[in-house]
């Protein structure tokens, strides 16, 4: 008798994706972040659903409805903080996942990679709109500043901004539509993630050496299901430590003040996971130039397959490229720090140097290093 999990139309899909999937025998813990992102997404959708049951998307009541969730709803505070800090965990996993892809040359799976580049954009849009919903000071001013960037687009910029706002400033219409988009986007992200997996399973996973693992495959279950569960436990442990002991560690105190269009906060800054891009935006004195640099800072990932000059796929056996990769990581941490600092000396010049460094490393130095490594091996 044939096994139902291999014959049933629905079970067959699950079986081929998570049970009998042939996986490389040597993939390290850096390959855990895909499943962790899936867990994060499910967690965000569930906590978000329960928050939406008590939230009102209206400028007059949004702030007080969030207060009501925290004070009066049974375990509302834990749901709210799990959702807020869950976003931070989501981005930590996202950065690790992309970093893994860059280090081990996973971007050579073109379709998987290109769908994967769309995912951070969708996630960032979702997180930005979610940050606006509590209608605190940083929500309002963050929404005003970031949506205003679109006015840098020639000819249509101003009309576009007013169209997004639904008026002449960030107001009730803006909040309502942001709530609608914030609700729908995670489901679009889930659909894109399924397409991402579909393309990945066409080729099979990469592995740390970057060589073909067709001759040495093991079933996904039980080996990687167990390995993923360890990752999930560590993720939940970290999340709950944040939620229960330091729920506001990564937030902004300004967001505990209700939105006031007549009072601008001294330092307008986004959540920590946008700071690197915000620093790049601020480092260019021209508005349109800054917006282009901001978009390119993430869109540059699309160019990675074109910039790959090495005869080897992975950086595992390429020490010069490894050094440049870790310099890039340090540079991104520097940009994250600068993005949270006020616009004054010496932060301005540090931000500009770090921004130049970021693009130079990716567009110039890493391809040169790859070519040098090829020559050293007489390839």
Swiss-Prot record:
<keyword id="KW-0479">Metal-binding</keyword>
<keyword id="KW-1133">Transmembrane helix</keyword>
<feature type="transmembrane region" description="Helical">
    <location>
        <begin position="288"/>
        <end position="308"/>
    </location>
</feature>
<keyword id="KW-0830">Ubiquinone</keyword>
<dbReference type="InterPro" id="IPR030689">
    <property type="entry name" value="Cytochrome_b"/>
</dbReference>
<feature type="binding site" description="axial binding residue">
    <location>
        <position position="83"/>
    </location>
    <ligand>
        <name>heme b b562</name>
    </ligand>
</feature>
<dbReference type="GO" id="GO:0006122">
    <property type="term" value="P:mitochondrial electron transport, ubiquinol to cytochrome c"/>
</dbReference>
<dbReference type="Pfam" id="PF00033">
    <property type="entry name" value="Cytochrome_B"/>
</dbReference>
<keyword id="KW-0999">Mitochondrion inner membrane</keyword>
<dbReference type="InterPro" id="IPR048260">
    <property type="entry name" value="Cytochrome_b_C_euk/bac"/>
</dbReference>
<comment type="similarity">
    <text>Belongs to the cytochrome b family.</text>
</comment>
<dbReference type="GO" id="GO:0045275">
    <property type="term" value="C:respiratory chain complex III"/>
</dbReference>
<dbReference type="InterPro" id="IPR005798">
    <property type="entry name" value="Cyt_b/b6_C"/>
</dbReference>
<keyword id="KW-0812">Transmembrane</keyword>
<keyword id="KW-0408">Iron</keyword>
<dbReference type="GO" id="GO:0008121">
    <property type="term" value="F:ubiquinol-cytochrome-c reductase activity"/>
</dbReference>
<feature type="binding site">
    <location>
        <position position="201"/>
    </location>
    <ligand>
        <name>a ubiquinone</name>
    </ligand>
</feature>
<feature type="binding site" description="axial binding residue">
    <location>
        <position position="97"/>
    </location>
    <ligand>
        <name>heme b b566</name>
    </ligand>
</feature>
<keyword id="KW-0679">Respiratory chain</keyword>
<feature type="transmembrane region" description="Helical">
    <location>
        <begin position="33"/>
        <end position="53"/>
    </location>
</feature>
<comment type="function">
    <text>Component of the ubiquinol-cytochrome c reductase complex (complex III or cytochrome b-c1 complex) that is part of the mitochondrial respiratory chain. The b-c1 complex mediates electron transfer from ubiquinol to cytochrome c. Contributes to the generation of a proton gradient across the mitochondrial membrane that is then used for ATP synthesis.</text>
</comment>
<keyword id="KW-0472">Membrane</keyword>
<keyword id="KW-0249">Electron transport</keyword>
<keyword id="KW-0349">Heme</keyword>
<keyword id="KW-0813">Transport</keyword>
<dbReference type="InterPro" id="IPR005797">
    <property type="entry name" value="Cyt_b/b6_N"/>
</dbReference>
<feature type="transmembrane region" description="Helical">
    <location>
        <begin position="347"/>
        <end position="367"/>
    </location>
</feature>
<comment type="subunit">
    <text>The cytochrome bc1 complex contains 11 subunits: 3 respiratory subunits (MT-CYB, CYC1 and UQCRFS1), 2 core proteins (UQCRC1 and UQCRC2) and 6 low-molecular weight proteins (UQCRH/QCR6, UQCRB/QCR7, UQCRQ/QCR8, UQCR10/QCR9, UQCR11/QCR10 and a cleavage product of UQCRFS1). This cytochrome bc1 complex then forms a dimer.</text>
</comment>
<feature type="binding site" description="axial binding residue">
    <location>
        <position position="182"/>
    </location>
    <ligand>
        <name>heme b b562</name>
    </ligand>
</feature>
<dbReference type="InterPro" id="IPR048259">
    <property type="entry name" value="Cytochrome_b_N_euk/bac"/>
</dbReference>
<feature type="transmembrane region" description="Helical">
    <location>
        <begin position="226"/>
        <end position="246"/>
    </location>
</feature>
<feature type="binding site" description="axial binding residue">
    <location>
        <position position="196"/>
    </location>
    <ligand>
        <name>heme b b566</name>
    </ligand>
</feature>
<dbReference type="Pfam" id="PF00032">
    <property type="entry name" value="Cytochrom_B_C"/>
</dbReference>
<keyword id="KW-0496">Mitochondrion</keyword>
<feature type="transmembrane region" description="Helical">
    <location>
        <begin position="113"/>
        <end position="133"/>
    </location>
</feature>
<dbReference type="InterPro" id="IPR016174">
    <property type="entry name" value="Di-haem_cyt_TM"/>
</dbReference>
<feature type="transmembrane region" description="Helical">
    <location>
        <begin position="320"/>
        <end position="340"/>
    </location>
</feature>
<dbReference type="InterPro" id="IPR036150">
    <property type="entry name" value="Cyt_b/b6_C_sf"/>
</dbReference>
<protein>
    <recommendedName>
        <fullName>Cytochrome b</fullName>
    </recommendedName>
</protein>
<feature type="transmembrane region" description="Helical">
    <location>
        <begin position="77"/>
        <end position="98"/>
    </location>
</feature>
<dbReference type="GO" id="GO:0046872">
    <property type="term" value="F:metal ion binding"/>
</dbReference>
<dbReference type="InterPro" id="IPR027387">
    <property type="entry name" value="Cytb/b6-like_sf"/>
</dbReference>
